[in-house]
Amino acid sequence: MKPRTTTRLRPVAGLFLVAALVAACSSSPGNTGSAAAGPRGAATPSTYQVGVIGGGDGGEPVKGGTLTFGAYAEAAVLDPARTIVAGSTGGLEMAAIYDVLMRWDSATGEVRPQLAKGLEASDGYTTWTLTLRDGVMFSDGTPLDAKAVKWSLDRYVEKGADEARLWKDNVTSITTPDDSTVVLKLGRKWPTFPYMLTTGPGMIVARSADEGGAFKPVGAGAFTFGSYAEHEETVLNAREDYWDGRPNLDKIRIIYVTDPNALLDTFTSGGAQAAFLRDPQLIDKALAAGFPGYMNMVALGNVGVINASEGRPGADPRVRQAMFQAIKPEVIYQRSYNGAGVASTQVFPSFSRWHTDATSLPYDPDKARELLKQAKADGFDGKVTYLGRQDPAARATALAIKSMLESVGFQVELDLVRSVADQITKVSVNKDYDVAGWGISWREAGPYGRMFATLHSKGNLSVGMHTGPEMDALIDEFQVAETEGEQRAVMGRIQEQWNKDVPALVYGPTPEFLTWRKNVHGVEGTVNSMVLLDDAWIAPTG
């Protein structure tokens, strides 16, 4: 494929599924993150880093072939306005079909143009001018011009997409002065706005996708939608007229293997050339076997959200803090994952560019007993319900939490549901829980969006957690900060405010590893554990 000509974006400061639960904090204050003591050959803390691990350029690309990818979950619909855009939920497929206006480069921490030609800020980061490439066409033959981009962005908001509220709260107008220019006016300063165009809003959907009643995935990416067999596979076909030249691969085949262990077996035996893993034990096995891949560490991916709604035990901040200081995450991870993974009670542990010297609340069961005693003196009966799932790892986690909370005086009832869907309904839709296994998921690349959605009082993903004016002000301050140093300073104060608010119990980050076989090359990582495959190719041996 020809070298890509891009206009480089001036560096911008910054780097829902329920998460798998990780482990290990210590009794010392401010645990910054460590690998739990696991089996011989397990990954070390330094292994769990954001970016591409292993592999090489492979030499001259080879044309042709089908890349079979074992997905983590089956996306119900490949529509960025209706599906959360992440590697675990159809992000690879959607990036292949729609491309993205901008791409985050994990090696440099910069946002770069991809489908777009450039993006420039003016008026103190309140105006962003998006320049489009000439001659880019959707797969239906219509042009991807400024009007098409505006239509897709408006559609994204109208359909109430994952980041629609954040977009609507900030973007005041979209104008198209000519076919290749889109001007976005913001209501407030936002230096890291380009990250919004690396995910759902940056996946431009053609008008024809909505024609005829049933949605059809139509974009300007390197591949087109071919076929879909429910619970079996999705097939994408290479485009001859992709703007950056025909991709090397002929097809991408996405297969759905519901059991994570079976998925790894399928991958290691050669039944797939790539696979998405989130279980730390399985990630350790893939790393120990020397498979390359794209690693992402999702901060707050493994938490117990606390319902702070009126009438719930968590409405009392003393109860929230008592639960936090009664939990030792290493116990959870030893029981659930045989000690694999990284553990920390900090918002952003030591692996992160957002890590600061601000410490988290320490494991302190005596302090937990004291706080619980105070709450009981004011009428709290000490009873809480923990919501989890029935699969072995989730059940082990729930039992560990029950044991630790009861050791300081709580009475814990377990509510273990059968599926992720049941858990989402209880937590996100009905808010029918006291404490629940969950993933808040603040991403290393451009964390502001998830910060706003989950912990700002205007956010749409707080699921009943405590929000307040102090945290709102800090999140707003993070948004307008211009340099990474300024942002990191705010993040330290966010950690300190977290210690006061205790919106959730923190067990550690979630590792997400999109691994591929050694003869696969040209895979590019971007945000939300997604990869781009327009330059990917498969060597005949390896």
Model-derived regions: residue spans:
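N-terminal lobe/hinge region of extracytoplasmic solute-binding protein
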Residues: L67-D123, K216-G219
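Gly/Pro-rich hinge or "lid" segments in bacterial periplasmic/extracellular proteins
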Residues: S88, L197-P247, K251, N261, ...
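Aromatic- and charge-enriched surface segment that lines or borders ligand/interaction sites
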Residues: K117-A161, P177, V183, P313
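Ligand-site clamp/hinge motif
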Residues: E211, E240-K285, Q411
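Surface-exposed binding/hinge segments that line
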Residues: T127, T131, R165-R207, S227
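Alpha-helical secondary-structure segments
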Residues: T68, L144-S152, D179-K185, G221-A222, ...
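Detector for C-terminal structural segments
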Residues: S27, A229, I327-R353, P392-K402, ...
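Bacterial lipoprotein signal-peptidase II cleavage site
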Residues: S26-A36
